[in-house]
Amino acid sequence: MRYSTVLAALALLGTSAVSVLAALPDQIDVKVKNLTPEDTIYDRTRQVFYQSNLYKGRIEVYNPKTQSHFNVVIDGASSNGDGEQQMSGLSLLTHDNSKRLFAVMKNAKSFNFADQSSHGASSFHSFNLPLSENSKPVWSVNFEKVQDEFEKKAGKRPFGVVQSAQDRDGNSYVAFALGMPAIARVSADGKTVSTFAWESGNGGQRPGYSGITFDPHSNKLIAFGGPRALTAFDVSKPYAWPEPVKINGDFGTLSGTEKIVTVPVGNESVLVGARAPYAISFRSWDNWKSANIKKTKRSELQNSGFTAVADYYQGSEQGLYAVSAFFDNGAHGGRSDYPLYKLDNSILNF
C-alpha cells in the first residue's frame, strides 16, 4: 500500500472518530404546541424523551433524531387543557432497560393559590414500555384515601403530588409538595397505597418536598426541598423516619427548589436538582448522611420555568439538559418551542 493511501485511510478514520464523538447540542428544540413540560426524562434504551404535558395531562413521547412525537392519553384524567388533573411528574422503573413508566397527576387546584384546594382528584399511573399512541395504564390509583389517612395521623393534609421514584422491588414513592412534607408508598402491583413518611413543615406556601428520587447504590430514597435541601429515607421498612442530609457547601435558599433526578456516573450515583437558574448536584460517600455539592447555571433558566434536569445520551456521550415548562404560556397560550438547554456536566464529577 502506498504511503499516500495510508494517510488517506488514517484521515478517514480520524473524520469518523470526530463524527462519533461530536459534541452534544447546546439545546434540543422540542416543537410541540402548548406542551408545558413540567417534567422530562430520557429513555436511553429506546432513545426517546417522555415529557409531562402539564395542563393536558398527557405523556408526550419525543424522538430527538426524527423530531417526531406522539401523545399518550389517560382516560378520565387527561383533557384538552382545562381538566381537573394535571401531569406533574414522570419516572422510570430502572434507568436502563426499563419495563415500566410512571406518571403523577396532581389536582389542578393544588397550585392555584388564588383558588386553592387540598381536596380533589389526584392520581398515579403505571405503563408498560414501549409506549404507543394506544397505550393505557396497567394500573392506576388515586390519592384521596391516603391523604385522609395522613390527615388522621399527622393532623394536616398533604396535597400537590409532584414527582415519583421507584425502589429495587418496584414499589413507588410519591412526594407531596403542599400541606406538609409527606411521601406515599404504592406497591409494585398498584394494589396498596400507604403512608410511608411525613414530618412537620417549616411554614411557607410550599412546605412539602418538591422532588424525590431513588439511589440504587445506597438503597436510599432522597427527597429534595421542603424542610431542608436533602432528606434520606430507608426503604427497607414499611414506614420511615426522615434522615436529614448534612450539606457540605453553600446550598443557598430552599425557595424555588423543583425536581431531582439520579444520574449514574460509573458505578456510583450523583443526584441533580433544579432551582432556577441553578442545577445543583449532590454526591455522598457515607450512605447519604452527608453530601458534597456543585452548581452550574444558564441565564436562560432564570425565567423559563426551570423544573427538572434530564440526563441525555448520544452513544457513550452523557449530557445534562435543563427542562423548562414556560408556565407563563398557560394552557392555551400558543407557544410551540420548548427547548432543552445543555448544562455543564462537569457537575457530575466529584
Swiss-Prot record:
Cellular component GO terms, alphabetical: extracellular region
Pfam families, A to Z: Mala_s_1-like (PF22701)
CDD domains cross-referenced by the UniProt entry: MALA
Chief site of localization: secreted
Keywords: Allergen, Cell wall, Secreted, Signal
Domain of life of the source: Eukaryota
Naturally occurring in which organism (per UniProt): Malassezia furfur (Pityriasis versicolor infection agent)
Span of the signal peptide: 1-22
Protein name: Major allergen Mal f 1
Protein localization: Secreted, Cell wall
